[in-house]
Structures are given as structure tokens and as C-alpha cells.
């Protein structure tokens, strides 16, 4: 730690009224670009307008101005998020059966959307139980509302109105901090202050206030709900906050107030700050007292973390010093210069954040089922499947975005002249070794993982089950995964005193939690089938990484096109007379990476969906016999490609294909429509630009003949635009097809 003389205290960090508010200017399409503002000559204009509207780098090269635009846009984004949240809460208040669900969450499905009868769509209002007809929702909002202690639709109304107020506030802030008081570049680059505020403020105080809310509001209300008290009889949230005796009836240590805290007698609080592990047998969710304890602990960690960096007082860490000290014996200059990169290139910063957030989102997907945090979430199979799928897709997109912005950084912001022998330079200098090794790994994984399946299909086809890789013939047990499971199953009591169960029931240990005759969670057995599909996961992930990383490392130059940096982030080919140089731009790598990301995530969510239906989800009889939805067929069926097609895709598609005439029929229509959207994408991906330009010429000829030719000349999409439209519809069609397939199936059988 370096002690320096304190910086001068007062800095003027904003410019007043830098840019006037002008509706006239905003009304002109393309006002941000001299070329686009001239108006359209050809139909390409509308595409360029969309491509460049948010590409602030193309509007100006002034980093301060770009930073202000990004900052202002963030407020706009927050405003939209608040508006969306408000809509969710409003639907809960106005169109939902939340209060009925609260009284009987095991037999009543959550619904917050009622279809109006216009041409017979009221068939979609299925009976979700308790005499309510509507569309079953799978977003998990009901469970999170119960966990936070919301007991009435009035409370949902109030929250919805509050969110609207915040949306308006954010909209105002976005305008204010661009037009009235715009921060200077130095403010955006003051990373220590930013870290302190984000760590201590957002994460620290945010977690602390949530922990406080849980202890004072959620826990007592959930105590009453679990005991079967009618929600209308439960005291209102403010009564618990204002009247300590009310809480003391539930948690006697409340009578002592803050005394145990200041006398370090903290064990007094162990009634409502617990470390139990496992699930609450009443709700099938994590113990809310464990969750409150967790948020309190997280708050303390982040409050400390928020006081670590040097700002106006000459004490604490400086990020630049930390980075420059970060050298190993084989890494040359190490992280020297990284500080400058991350404070002058927002693409580099964004890339890092997207990679982290994408990975974190995928971690969330896995925790949501292994450690279901909200009451009655684990037994709502449709919601569980939706949450897993949603977080997997989002994580995949964010990680591809990380590669995209890393490549944009390389093309637009990387300055090779002042980068020598630091880590990035060294990685770029041995990129051939990295990419060729990664390519070898992909080939190895691809042939071996699919080879195991093809072997099984062949043996199965020839009627030789004894020669297949399976739990009953040649076993390939995932021994490392089983060892990890076993270690965690035996961990309680060692990790924390008083912990009664392991962090997740999925580890093992024979415990099963069922709520209302439905399995919430039980130990998940892993076998040969999982070993096989996990190697497919390894294969698809490595190929995605290969494509994306090649795009980043060869974004500026390659043996084929040494001057690639001059061509920009996206270009179709390296000009006329250079055949074989198409699809090499950094943008094209993102484009190709998206398809493999789609492959990778699809295999993951298929694996999850089938595995859970086969080995976890199901009903339990009074005698304690568990009947799984697909009767444990995963281990024997998923070890051949044919099994995946026959027993997963085909067998489980029957619900969506046969949904016509029922309340699930919308999923049948979506299944059909999304297939069409997907097929439509192929038209853009398989044909070249010339084909369409030729077609357009003859259509224009016909218009001229009839004297109805438009002033704006029609043009075929550029090669890059065509690919963009293609991949968009490919992903949209594929994801919506999967969505309809999953939901129709799980709502019907779950």
C-alpha cells in the first residue's frame, strides 16, 4: 500500500448545459451522421440508420462525448426496466390469482394473464385451479413475491406505481446528465471512486437493506403463511417494523434489541440468522433464515470491499499500482498498460463485464434448480424449466457479446505502438499456437464424444446391447463428478457448526424433499449417459470458444489479410480481385460464434429437461414411492443419438403437436410459426446478394412499366446485413420453437 499526499479536495466534475435540448434536431432521422442525415437515395439508408444509431464511436471520436452518451443511455435502459417491472407487478395486481395461489400454492397454478374473447382465444384461459381461468405463467414472480412478504394485490399495485415513478425519474436523469450537468471524462475514469460506490453502495448497502427487509418483513410474514394463517389476518409489513413486540412473539431475541450485537453475543440472533443448509420441508425452498444470514454476510464483505480503494484520502489501493505489480516469471511486463486500456476503451471494459456477467448468469441458472431460493419454486416444474432455459440463453448471448466487444476493442481502440511485451501483446504473438491447439482439442472432443454415441447406435442397431457403453454393459462412470458430489454430501457439520444438511440436496445423502405429493428435490444420480452428454457439452463449448477467440486474436491482422485493421470491424471480403477472403472480419466470427453458442446451449437445456423429468421430477405416494415423469428412462435412452430423437424430441413433442383445441394451443401455433421463422432465416443464409439484386432489378422494371417506381432506389441487403438478418431469425425461430416445445410439454405433464 502506498501512502501519498492527499489529492486537492474539490474538483469540478461536471459541465453545465453542454448540449441544448432540441426536439427539432431529434425529429430528423440520422441527425447523428452527416451522410445519413441527407436522407435516403436507396433502401440501404434505413439499414445504415439502424446499424449506426447506437454506434456512438461512429458519431464522434471524442471519448468524453461518447462516455456521456453511454451514461445517459444507461438511464434510459433503467427506465425501460422499471417500466417492465411495473407492468409485471401491475399484472399481478390486476389480472392474477396471486391471493388464491398464496392460500394453496401446491394445487393452484400461478396465472397473471387473462385472454379477452375476440375470435375465440378465450380457449387459452386454462383452469389453473381454485376456479380461476387464465394462462399459466412460468416467470417465478409469484414465488419471489411470497418470499419478499407480499400478501395482497394492493401491495402489488403500490409497488407497480412506485416502479413507474422510478421509471420517470430515470428518464429525467438520463436527460439531466447529458443536457444539464454532464460529467467530465475524469469522472468516468475515476475507477477507485466508482469501485467504492458500487461495492459499498450498490452491493453492500443493497444487500444490507434486503437482509433488513427479510428479517423485519419477509421472515415473520412467511412464518405465518407456512403455519397456514390466512393472508388477510397477517399484520401488515409496517406493523412488524414499528412494533418490536410483534416480532418478539415470533423471535424472542428481538425483545433484546441491539444489545446482543454490541455485546458481541451474536448467537442470540441465531433464531432468524441460521446456517442450516438443505431445504425447508414446508415450501421446498431454501430456508429464508439462511438467505437473510447470507445477505447480511455478503453486505459486510462488500461494505469492507468498498473501503479498500484510494480516493481523496491518501490511503488504500490504487488500481493502476495493483495492475502494474501483477507480473509472473513468464509474463513479461504482465498487466502494465491494462489500466490505460480499461479507462480509455469502453469496449474493452464492456467485454470484460459481459464475460463475467455471462458466466455468472449461467451459474445462476444452475443454482436456481440445485438450491431453489423461493418458496414453492422447486415444485413448479414449468417455472423451474423456464428459469433454467432463460438464464442459459442469456448467459450464452452475453458471452458472445464479450467476444464481439473484445474484437471491436482490438480493431478500434488497440494501439500496438505503445503495447510491448505485456500480457496482451504476448498472447497476440503466440496466437497461432493457441488457436491451432484449441482446434486440435475441438477435433479430438468432436470425434470422441460423437464416436461414443455412434458406437452405441451401431451396437444397438445390430442388436448387441452387451457391447454398448451404458450403466448395464460397458460402464463409463463420471468418477470425478461422483467424487465431488460425495464430498459435498458428507460436508455438513465440517463446513459450519450447526449445519444440518449439505448446500444442495442434489449432491446426495439420500434425503428427499417433497411438497404436496410432488418431488421438490432429491439426490441426482450421475452415470454413463451423463458422462457421454457432458463430453458433447465440452465439445460445443470449445468450438464456440475457438470461433470467438480466433475472431478476437485475428481481428487486426492475419497471414491472409495483414492489414485487416484498416478494413474495420465488419466487412464482407477483402475487396475485388482477392478471392477466398470472405467471412474473415471480426464481425463474421461473432456471426458464426452465435450458431455454435446456440448448439451448445440447446444441448444443455435438452440434457437438463430430460434428466430432471427422468430422475428428479415426479410424484410421491403415501408409501414413499417416487414415480418420475418419464420413469427414469434417461440412463438407457440418451446413450444413443436415436434415443435422443425418439425418446426425447419425438416422444415429448406429442404435447405441443396435439395441443390444438386445448388451452395449450397457443404453444402449438408458436411451435409451427417459430419453425417457419427459423426456415425463413435459411433464405438469407444460403443465397448470395447478387441473386436478390438480380430479382430486384426485374421487379423495378415492372414498377417502371406501370409508372409506380419509388423515388428511393431498392437495393438488396449487403452481404453483412443479409447475414445479420439470417442469424437473427435463426436464433429467434430456434429459441421460440424450443420455448413452445418445453412449455407445452411441462405444463401438460408437470
Swiss-Prot record:
The gene is psaA. This is Photosystem I P700 chlorophyll a apoprotein A1. [4Fe-4S] cluster binds at residues 573, 582. Phylloquinone binds at residue 692. It is an enzyme of class 1 (oxidoreductase). HAMAP family: PSI_PsaA. It is a multi-pass membrane protein. Chlorophyll a binds at residues 683, 691. Its EC number is 1.97.1.12. PsaA and PsaB bind P700, the primary electron donor of photosystem I (PSI), as well as the electron acceptors A0, A1 and FX. PSI is a plastocyanin-ferredoxin oxidoreductase, converting photonic excitation into a charge separation, which transfers an electron from the donor P700 chlorophyll pair to the spectroscopically characterized acceptors A0, A1, FX, FA and FB in turn. Oxidized P700 is reduced on the lumenal side of the thylakoid membrane by plastocyanin. Keywords: 4Fe-4S, Chlorophyll, Chloroplast, Chromophore, Electron transport, Iron, Iron-sulfur, Magnesium, Membrane, Metal-binding, Oxidoreductase, Photosynthesis, Photosystem I, Plastid, Thylakoid, Transmembrane, Transmembrane helix, Transport. Belongs to the PsaA/PsaB family. GO terms for cellular component: chloroplast thylakoid membrane; photosystem I. Pfam families: PsaA_PsaB. Chlorophyll a' binds at residue 675. The PsaA/B heterodimer binds the P700 chlorophyll special pair and subsequent electron acceptors. PSI consists of a core antenna complex that captures photons, and an electron transfer chain that converts photonic excitation into a charge separation. The eukaryotic PSI reaction center is composed of at least 11 subunits. It catalyses: reduced [plastocyanin] + hnu + oxidized [2Fe-2S]-[ferredoxin] = oxidized [plastocyanin] + reduced [2Fe-2S]-[ferredoxin]. It is found in: Plastid, Chloroplast thylakoid membrane. GO terms for molecular function: 4 iron, 4 sulfur cluster binding; chlorophyll binding; electron transfer activity; magnesium ion binding; oxidoreductase activity.
Amino acid at each position: 500500500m502506498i501512502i501519498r499526499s492527499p489529492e486537492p479536495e474539490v474538483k469540478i466534475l461536471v459541465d453545465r448545459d453542454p448540449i441544448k435540448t432540441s426536439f427539432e434536431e431529434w425529429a430528423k432521422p440520422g441527425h447523428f451522421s452527416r451522410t445519413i442525415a441527407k436522407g435516403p437515395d436507396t433502401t440501404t439508408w434505413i439499414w445504415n440508420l439502424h446499424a449506426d444509431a447506437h454506434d456512438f464511436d461512429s458519431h464522434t471520436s471524442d471519448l468524453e462525448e461518447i462516455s456521456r452518451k453511454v451514461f445517459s443511455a444507461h438511464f434510459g435502459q433503467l427506465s425501460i426496466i422499471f417500466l417492465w417491472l411495473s407492468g409485471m407487478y401491475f399484472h399481478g395486481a390486476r389480472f392474477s390469482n396471486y391471493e388464491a395461489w398464496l392460500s394453496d400454492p401446491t394445487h393452484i397454478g400461478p396465472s397473471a394473464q387473462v385472454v379477452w374473447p375476440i375470435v375465440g382465444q378465450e380457449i387459452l384461459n386454462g383452469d389453473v385451479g381454485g376456479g380461476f381461468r387464465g394462462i399459466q405463467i412460468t416467470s417465478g414472480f409469484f414465488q419471489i413475491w411470497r418470499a419478499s412478504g407480499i400478501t395482497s394485490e394492493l401491495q402489488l399495485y403500490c409497488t407497480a406505481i412506485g416502479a413507474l415513478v422510478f421509471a420517470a425519474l430515470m428518464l429525467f436523469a438520463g436527460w439531466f446528465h447529458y443536457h444539464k450537468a454532464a460529467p467530465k471524462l475524469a469522472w468516468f475514469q475515476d475507477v477507485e471512486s466508482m469501485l467504492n460506490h458500487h461495492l459499498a453502495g450498490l452491493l453492500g448497502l443493497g444487500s444490507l437493506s434486503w437482509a433488513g427487509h427479510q428479517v423485519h418483513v419477509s421472515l415473520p410474514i412467511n412464518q405465518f403463511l407456512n403455519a397456514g394463517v390466512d393472508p388477510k389476518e397477517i399484520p401488515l409489513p409496517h406493523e412488524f417494523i414499528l412494533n418490536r413486540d410483534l416480532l418478539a412473539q415470533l423471535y424472542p431475541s428481538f425483545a433484546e434489541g441491539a444489545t446482543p450485537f454490541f455485546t458481541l453475543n451474536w448467537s442470540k440472533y441465531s433464531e432468524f440468522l441460521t446456517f442450516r443448509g438443505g431445504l425447508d420441508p414446508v415450501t421446498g425452498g431454501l430456508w429464508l433464515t439462511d438467505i437473510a444470514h447470507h445477505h447480511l454476510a455478503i453486505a459486510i464483505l462488500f461494505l469492507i470491499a468498498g473501503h479498500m480503494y484510494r480516493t481523496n484520502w491518501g490511503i488504500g489501493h490504487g488500481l493502476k499500482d495493483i495492475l502494474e505489480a501483477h507480473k509472473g516469471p513468464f509474463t513479461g511486463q504482465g498487466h502494465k498498460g491494462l489500466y490505460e486500456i480499461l479507462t480509455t476503451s469502453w469496449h474493452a471494459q464492456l467485454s470484460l463485464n459481459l464475460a463475467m456477467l455471462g458466466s455468472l448468469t449461467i451459474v445462476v441458472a444452475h443454482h436456481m434448480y440445485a438450491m431453489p431460493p423461493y418458496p414453492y419454486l422447486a415444485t413448479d416444474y414449468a417455472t423451474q424449466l423456464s428459469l433454467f432455459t432463460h438464464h442459459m440463453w442469456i448467459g450464452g448471448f452475453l458471452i458472445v457479446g464479450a467476444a464481439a466487444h473484445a474484437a471491436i476493442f482490438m480493431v478500434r481502440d488497440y494501439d500496438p505502438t505503445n503495447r510491448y511485451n505485456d500480457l496482451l501483446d504476448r498472447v497476440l504473438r503466440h496466437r497461432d499456437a493457441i488457436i491451432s491447439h484449441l482446434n486440435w482439442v475441438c477435433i479430438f472432443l468432436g470425434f470422441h464424444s460423437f464416436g461414443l454415441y455412434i458406437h452405441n447406435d451401431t451396437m444397438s442397431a445390430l442388436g448387441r446391447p452387451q457391447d454398448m457403453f451404458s450403466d448395464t454393459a460397458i460402464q463409463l462412470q463420471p468418477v470425478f463428478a461422483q467424487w465431488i458430489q460425495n464430498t459435498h454430501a458428507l460436508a455438513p457439520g465440517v463446513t459450519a457448526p450447526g449445519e444440518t444438511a449439505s448446500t444442495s440436496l442434489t449432491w446426495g445423502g439420500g434425503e428427499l424433499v417433497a411438497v404436496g405429493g410432488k418431488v421438490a428435490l432429491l439426490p441426482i444420480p450421475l452415470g454413463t449417459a451423463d458422462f457421454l452428454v457432458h463430453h458433447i457439452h465440452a465439445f460445443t463449448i470449445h468450438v464456440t470458444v475457438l470461433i470467438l477467440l480466433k475472431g478476437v486474436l485475428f481481428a487486426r491482422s492475419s497471414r491472409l489479410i495483414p492489414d485487416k485493421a484498416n478494413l474495420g470491424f465488419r466487412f464482407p471480403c477483402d475487396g475485388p480481385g482477392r478471392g477466398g477472403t470472405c467471412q474473415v472480419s471480426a464481425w463474421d466470427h461473432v456471426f458464426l460464434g452465435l450458431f455454435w453458442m446456440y448448439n451448445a446451449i440447446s444441448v444443455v437445456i435438452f440434457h437438463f429437461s430430460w434428466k430432471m423429468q427422468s430422475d428428479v421430477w415426479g410424484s410421491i405416494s403415501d408409501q414413499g414411492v417416487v414415480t418420475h415423469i418419464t420413469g427414469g428412462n434417461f440412463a438407457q435412452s440418451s446413450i444413443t443419438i436415436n434415443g435422443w430423437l425418439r425418446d426425447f424430441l419425438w416422444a415429448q413433442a406429442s404435447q405441443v403437436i396435439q395441443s390444438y383445441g386445448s388451452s395449450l394451443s397457443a404453444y402449438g401455433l408458436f411451435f409451427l410459426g417459430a419453425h417457419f421463422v427459423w426456415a425463413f432465416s435459411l433464405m438469407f443464409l444460403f443465397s448470395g446478394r447478387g441473386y436478390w439484386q438480380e430479382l430486384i432489378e426485374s421487379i423495378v422494371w415492372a414498377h417502371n412499366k406501370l409508372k409506380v417506381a419509388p423515388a428511393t432506389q431498392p437495393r438488396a441487403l449487403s452481404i453483412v446485413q443479409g447475414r445479420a438478418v439470417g442469424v437473427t431469425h435463426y436464433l429467434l425461430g430456434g429459441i421460440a420453437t424450443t420455448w413452445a416445445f418445453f412449455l407445452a410439454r411441462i405444463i401438460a405433464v408437470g
